[in-house]
């Protein structure tokens, strides 16, 4: 508990003393999969962003499609922070209850957790004093640890003793973040 308080204090101290933007992804939000984040200055050309993407829904076929993605990311801006091109590197985590694309015509789905390591490229354009647009795309490698179930009975169907494992190279983030400067 003490460590959490110290980390929270340090984080909010940095945020309160630097340029900080809160963000929402216009594209994913229109698709009812909100992606929100916060980006703050940590150096002359460096920023740190933390964002969360969440799907709370089932698919249009009524199959499991819930997932949560948590991504902390370091960003290097080539021109100046919050203006122009940047590259980012991130490590993130996932929680999912999902039917993968190759199981669409079956009764199978997976529940699991995972981690990802990847990169982002983007361009930020200031549009008003406190607003900017952040155009970005990113992806990387996702390693998943899951258990397979039947949708109809919720019975476990895989043969793994503990968890199945899988890894994929995926584009898993992108869009247009509408950003508002807090200070």
Residue ranges and their predicted role:
Residues 137-150:
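Short, solvent-exposed beta-strand-terminating loops
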Residues 19-21, 56, 101-106, 156-163:
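Extracytoplasmic loops and strand-loop junctions of Gram-negative outer membrane beta-barrel proteins
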Residues 42-44, 151, 155:
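Short alpha-helical hairpin
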Residues 21-36, 59-66:
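Solvent-exposed loop/turn segments connecting transmembrane beta-strands
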Residues 36, 100-101, 146-149:
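Short aromatic-enriched loop/helix-cap "lid" or pocket-rim segments at secondary-structure transitions
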Residues 1-21, 178, 182:
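Bacterial Sec-dependent N-terminal signal peptides
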Residues 40-135, 180-182:
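Gram-negative (and chloroplast) outer-membrane scaffold detector with strong preference
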Residues 77, 168-183:
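Outer-membrane beta-barrel "beta-signal"
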């Amino acid at each position: 508990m003490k460590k959490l308080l110290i980390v929270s204090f340090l984080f909010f101290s940095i945020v309160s003393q630097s340029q900080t933007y809160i963000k929402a992804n216009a594209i994913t939000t229109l698709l009812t999969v909100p992606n929100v984040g916060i980006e703050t200055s940590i150096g002359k050309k460096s920023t740190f962003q933390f964002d969360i993407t969440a799907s709370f829904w089932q698919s249009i076929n009524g199959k499991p499609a819930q997932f949560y993605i948590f991504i902390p990311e370091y960003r290097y801006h080539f021109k100046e922070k919050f203006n122009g091109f940047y590259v980012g590197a991130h490590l993130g985590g996932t929680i999912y209850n999902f039917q993968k694309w190759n199981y669409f015509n079956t009764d199978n789905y997976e529940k699991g957790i995972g981690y990802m390591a990847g990169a982002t490229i983007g361009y930020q354009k200031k549009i008003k004093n406190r607003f900017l647009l952040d155009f970005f795309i990113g992806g990387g490698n996702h390693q998943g640890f899951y258990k397979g179930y039947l949708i109809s009975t919720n019975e476990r169907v895989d043969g793994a003793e503990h968890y199945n494992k899988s890894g994929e190279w995926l584009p898993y983030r992108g869009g247009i973040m509408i950003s508002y400067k807090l200070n």
